[in-house]
């Protein structure tokens, strides 16, 4: 059902927000293509954008620089628009090792990946919403510029069912298999269907909790209803329903066979080229690999690495950009680029890295040249496809200022009256000892501390040293996966530890009101980690606390430091003036600590196959156990974990796995 965006919130725009919303909406309706929303941390940028979305009533794509921030934005927009389609579109790989060849050592690395089915379902839900309704907001990462199935094919393949429609059961089953649904009479899982007499049950690939029941009588659809696959209970009756393909890459049998013919033509042409260059090994390798893929496609309709033939399957010309999520957007949509100073360069970098790897594969006979067209968009191609846009950042880059041609809307005043953190400069020589005393002072007040270092080694050494001093500390580094990163941030807010150390991970979008001190070590070392925008962003992490401070440990004031300090002081001055004029007393942000992405954590409600299950855990004080007791407890828990796994109780097994990990940490500590 398509409706209007309805913003649900217990507060109304205040401070700079009303003027910013009005200006953004007016410019959008005036046809201004690019705008900049320059908003300080805690000024309500997300809420401001939500108000803009409600007023313009257009499908919206919000791009974020990483999965952590995308998850946070998804949670916030979901709360603002509970009655509308708020969707999540990020890479569905939990693990991804791309296909690669290293000529120096003659090493070929096969593609290896692990797909997160929950995120795949959310991606399918996002594209279905974009094609079927107008009140849709999709939160995405740079995954949005990577190749996807063509929307025309996706739409043409869908199965539209209406009450009273004439359709034979055999015809219905054939159509479902064309959509790549599998028949499963034992367990109705997402992307499958079952047949019981004249009743066909389908669990749509994009559905989170509800399956479709199609009741036929004498070749006619007598009843359509959504039901709970676990209990069988009917949720609601329907007049009409569209079943979309199980995957974005589904295509018709005719298109697949046509692609096989064009791939054969390309293979013949490229083999002649390789033989002409006397590359006999490469030619033999390519012929063998491609022939195997062609046989698989002809027999079963797909093969491993079928995405490398996407140009043939979509009918695109050589060099033509692949279809992406942007092709699913209507022309009048709104694009919001959050933390644009990071996201914009990221978009520009994707194509080059992908290209160099694939050129090696093509040169040495592992892939046909058409594999080069299975790629992300080039930056200029992305620009052409982008609808009217709003760049959102506390520190917009030169590109954003140039593109917006002066249309910069500022959000400097916070609704809470909070002013930007006070900045202190302290000497490097005593930075660690001084940091310890500052941390202890914050802990006494019940506050948290963020510390940013220049190198991984320094972060590790500092974490180890502070831990030895009795400080509860964690280290956030690039090897930690998305879900665990979300959990670490949540644990910091909950007070399970007091200090978080990082390198380049403490900047954009980490919303932690409990943090009152940000310490930047070696602030006078010029570089991208200590650039003006990096410093402003890092300092801003303490801006949600009334006691917010930033300490820059430096022996000299660099140009970047001076620019960051001057800009922060300009904002502080404007904020103080506004507070004085309106009689506002600053107060810290109070935000409930909740999971920003449902199903992201163990220990929260995990939705699967139409049921909500809560995994409860009894808190345990592992610190009170000695080494022998810890070893014995771990042995008992491991036996329980394996038993749960044998009984297919994987959520309980995962919970115990986490308990074992905490025991192991307690034993090492």
Swiss-Prot record:
According to the UniProt entry, the coiled-coil residues are none
Where would you say this protein principally sits, based on its record? cytoplasm
Q: Does the keyword DNA damage apply?
A: yes
**Gene3D superfamilies on file:** P-loop containing nucleotide triphosphate hydrolases, UVR domain
Q: Where in the cell is it found?
A: Cytoplasm
Q: Where are the transmembrane segments?
A: none
Pfam families for the chain: Helicase_C (PF00271), ResIII (PF04851), UVR (PF02151), UvrB (PF12344), UvrB_inter (PF17757)
Q: Which InterPro entries match?
A: Helicase/UvrB_N, Helicase_ATP-bd, Helicase_C-like, P-loop_NTPase, UVR_dom, UVR_dom_sf, UvrB, UvrB_inter
For this protein, the record's PANTHER family field holds: UVRABC SYSTEM PROTEIN B
The protein depicted here goes by the name: UvrABC system protein B
């Amino acid at each position: 059902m398509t409706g209007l965006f309805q913003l649900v919130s217990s507060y109304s725009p205040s401070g700079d927000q009303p003027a910013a919303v009005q200006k953004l909406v007016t410019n959008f309706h005036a046809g201004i293509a690019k705008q900049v929303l320059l908003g300080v941390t805690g000024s309500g940028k997300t809420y401001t954008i939500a108000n803009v979305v409600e007023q313009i009533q257009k499908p919206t794509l919000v791009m974020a620089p990483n999965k952590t921030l995308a998850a946070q934005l998804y949670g916030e927009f979901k709360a603002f628009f509970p009655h509308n389609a708020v969707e999540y579109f990020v890479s569905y790989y939990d693990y991804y090792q791309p296909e690669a060849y290293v000529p120096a050592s003659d090493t070929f690395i096969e593609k290896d990946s692990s797909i997160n089915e929950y995120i795949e379902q959310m991606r399918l839900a996002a594209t279905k919403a974009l094609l079927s309704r107008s009140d849709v907001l999709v939160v995405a990462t740079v995954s949005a510029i990577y190749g996807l199935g063509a929307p025309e094919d996706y739409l043409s393949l869908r199965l539209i069912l209406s009450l009273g429609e004439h359709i034979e059961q055999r015809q219905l089953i054939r159509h479902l298999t064309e959509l790549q649904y599998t028949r499963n009479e034992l367990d109705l899982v997402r992307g499958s269907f079952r047949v019981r007499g004249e009743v066909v049950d389908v669990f749509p690939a994009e559905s989170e909790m509800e399956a479709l029941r199609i009741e036929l009588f004498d070749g006619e659809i007598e009843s359509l209803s959504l039901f709970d696959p676990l209990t069988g209970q009917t949720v609601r009756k329907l007049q009409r329903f569209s079943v979309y393909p199980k995957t974005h890459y589904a295509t018709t049998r005719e298109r697949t066979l046509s692609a096989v013919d064009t791939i054969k033509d390309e293979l013949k042409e490229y083999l002649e080229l390789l033989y002409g260059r006397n590359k006999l090994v490469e030619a033999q390798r390519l012929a063998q690999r491609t022939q195997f893929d062609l046989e698989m496609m002809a027999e079963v309709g797909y093969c491993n690495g079928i995405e490398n033939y996407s140009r043939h399957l979509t009918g695109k010309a050589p060099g033509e950009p692949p279809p992406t999520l942007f092709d699913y957007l209507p022309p009048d949509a709104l694009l919001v680029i959050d933390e644009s100073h990071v996201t914009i360069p990221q978009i520009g970098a994707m194509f080059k890295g992908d290209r160099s790897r694939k050129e090696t594969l093509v040169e040495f006979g592992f892939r046909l040249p058409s594999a080069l067209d299975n790629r992300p968009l080039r930056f200029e191609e992305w620009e052409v496809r982008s609808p009217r846009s709003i760049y959102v950042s506390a520190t917009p880059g030169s590109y954003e200022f140039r593109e917006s041609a002066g249309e910069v809307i500022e959000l400097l005043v916070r609704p809470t009256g909070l002013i930007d953190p006070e900045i202190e400069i302290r000497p490097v020589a005593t930075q660690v000892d001084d940091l310890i005393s500052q941390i202890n002072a914050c802990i006494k007040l019940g506050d948290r501390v963020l510390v940013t270092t220049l190198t991984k080694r320094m972060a590790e050494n500092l974490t180890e040293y502070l831990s030895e001093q009795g400080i509860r500390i964690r280290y956030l580094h690039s090897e930690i996966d998305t879900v665990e990163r979300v959990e670490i941030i949540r644990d910091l807010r909950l007070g399970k530890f007091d200090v978080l150390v990082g390198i380049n991970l403490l900047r954009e979008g980490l919303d932690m009101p409990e943090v009152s001190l940000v310490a930047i070590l070696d602030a006078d070392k010029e570089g991208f980690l200590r650039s003006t925008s990096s410093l402003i962003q890092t300092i801003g992490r303490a801006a949600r606390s009334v006691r917010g401070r930033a300490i820059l440990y430096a022996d000299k004031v660099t140009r970047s430091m001076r620019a960051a300090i001057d800009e922060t002081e300009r904002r502080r001055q404007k904020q103080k003036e506004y507070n004085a004029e309106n009689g506002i007393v600053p107060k810290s942000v109070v935000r409930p600590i909740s999971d920003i992405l449902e199903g992201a954590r163990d220990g929260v409600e995990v939705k699967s196959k139409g049921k909500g299950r809560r995994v409860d855990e009894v808190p345990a004080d592992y610190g009170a156990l000695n080494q022998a007791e810890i070893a014995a407890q771990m042995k008992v828990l491991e036996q329980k974990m394996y038993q749960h796994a044998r009984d297919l109780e994987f959520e309980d097994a995962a919970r115990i796995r986490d308990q074992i990990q905490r025991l192991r940490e307690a034993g090492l500590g």
